[in-house]
From Swiss-Prot:
It catalyses: NAD(+) + ATP = ADP + NADP(+) + H(+). GO terms for molecular function: ATP binding; metal ion binding; NAD binding; NAD+ kinase activity. It is an enzyme of class 2 (transferase). GO terms for cellular component: cytoplasm. This is NAD kinase. Its main location: cytoplasm. Its EC number is 2.7.1.23. Its cofactor is a divalent metal cation. Keywords: ATP-binding, Cytoplasm, Kinase, NAD, NADP, Nucleotide-binding, Transferase.
């Protein structure tokens, strides 16, 4: 069976030796298969490879058939989110990090020769990961890449003081909250910051988002799962003279003031992730979270 994907991009984590070594191994393997290979600019600098084709993330998204991201979940998160802004290029994750929720292929010879080989031949399963976009005070001029989240959008305390929020969903008043903040998470992000704050785990294929309070000053405040078609408006109240921080996937921090409004809704773009044919999301949860393990 011929390869389904012929032009393959490799993206690694900058300044990480073990990732660079894996990139070189991966490059050699793909070259043996007769595939055309392009390496992301910063990734190529960290390797000993010479006379290789290089490109930016935008160029990769527009020119390549598939992108392989080598590293941890953070590197996968950053690269796949940016690639999705420019095209529907599918992404494969090879884990050279710690947890590996998103980078589901192992970084070993067996995974290359069997799992990756099969995926590149087209024998794979697909997950479509939804993203969120936000704007502050209806500002539509913010750069798109600074407004899109694959995991979560969080509003958190900046000075060790709790602050107040007023939340509307689809134009209807939902609740007030005082505490350390609020996380609005995608299904992908439900196993990240949102889970640490006590939120539920959502299947990546579920068309939902979850609102998770952070250390709410009320026993009645609970996580809320809603449709991902909903529009969420969050107003900062003047309680405690707040200066909370708006973070998008842990980056692009913006200091907010009282009476400002943050609007969050589903982004039009999705991240397309390729897995092995027998990939089971619940296997990943069981392995990474230690389900069914004997504790004592």
């Amino acid at each position: 069976m011929a390869f389904k994907y012929h032009k393959v991009a490799i993206i690694g984590k900058h300044y990480k030796k073990e990732v660079s070594q894996m990139v070189e191994t991966l490059y050699a393997y793909l070259q043996q298969q007769g595939l055309e290979i392009i390496i992301e600019n910063d990734t190529a600098v960290d390797t000993s490879l010479v006379n290789v084709a290089i490109a930016s993330l935008k160029e990769i998204a527009l020119r390549c058939d598939v992108a392989i991201v080598v590293g941890g979940d953070g590197n996968f998160l950053k690269a796949s989110r940016l690639l999705a802004l420019y095209s529907n290029i599918p992404v494969i994750g090879i884990n050279k990090g710690k947890l590996g929720f998103l980078t589901t292929l192992a970084a070993d010879d067996n995974a290359l020769k069997n799992d990756l080989y099969a995926i590149l031949k087209g024998d794979s399963s697909v997950t479509k990961m939804s993203m969120l976009k936000c704007r502050v005070d209806n500002n539509l001029r913010a750069p798109l890449e600074a407004s899109i989240a694959l995991n979560e959008i969080a509003i958190t305390a900046s000075r060790g003081l709790m602050f107040g929020l007023k939340v509307f969903i689809d134009g209807r008043y939902a609740f007030d909250q005082r505490g350390d903040g609020l996380i609005v998470s995608t299904p992908t992000g439900s196993t990240a910051h949102a889970m640490s704050a006590g939120g539920p785990i959502l299947n990546p294929n579920q068309n939902s988002v979850v609102l998770v309070p952070i250390c709410s000053h009320s026993l009645n405040s609970r996580p809320l799962v809603i449709s991902d078609e909903s529009v969420i408006d969050i107003y900062i109240t003047d309680y405690n003279d707040p200066e909370p921080v708006l973070s998008i996937d842990g980056r692009h921090d913006t200091i907010l003031k009282a009476h400002q409004k943050v609007t969050i809704q589903k982004a039009r773009k999705k991240v397309t992730v390729l897995h092995t044919k027998d990939y089971n999301y619940y296997d990943t949860l069981r392995e990474k979270l230690g389900w069914s393990k004997v504790l004592f």
